[in-house]
C-alpha cells in the first residue's frame, strides 16, 4: 500500500501544467477593406467567401442568394453558421463558388462563412466548432470500379 502511495506521489511530482502560451491563440485576420476571407469546400465545390459588417446581404456569384439558391433548404444551410453564432443580419457576405452541384456549393459556402467568421471574430470559434461548422465534410463520390456498372452496382446477372 505504501509503495502505491509513494508511486502516486512520484507521479504527482512529474505533473506539468499547460500554460496559456502553449495553447493556440487565434487572432483577427482582416484585410485593408475590413473584410475577412476564407475558402470553404464540399464535394467538388470550392467557395471563396468574404464577410464584412453590414445589413446581412448575401451575394453568391454576383447574384442575390434567393435567385442563386432557389430551394429554401439550401438558403437555410447557408444561414446556419450566422444563426448559430447569433450574427444573422450583422454581416454582408460576398462569395464566389465554382464546381459541383447546388447542394455541394451550398455546403461549401456554409463552410467558408464559418471559417470567415472565425477570422473576423476568433471568440466565435468554440461555438462554431461545437456546431460542426468548421469541420470539412470529407465525403466525396466513390469512384466507379471496372467490372461493375457503377461504384458498387453489378451488371445484371442471368443464371441461364
From Swiss-Prot:
Entry's Gene Ontology molecular function annotations: RNA binding; structural constituent of ribosome
Keyword Ribosomal protein: yes
Cellular component terms (Gene Ontology): cytosolic small ribosomal subunit
Gene Ontology biological-process annotations: translation
Keyword Ribonucleoprotein among record annotations: yes
HAMAP family according to UniProt: Ribosomal_uS9_B
Note: The initiator methionine may be removed.
Family assignment from sequence similarity: Belongs to the universal ribosomal protein uS9 family.
The protein's name: Small ribosomal subunit protein uS9
Organism: Rhodopseudomonas palustris (strain ATCC BAA-98 / CGA009)
Taxonomy of the source species: Bacteria, Pseudomonadati, Pseudomonadota, Alphaproteobacteria, Hyphomicrobiales
Gene: rpsI
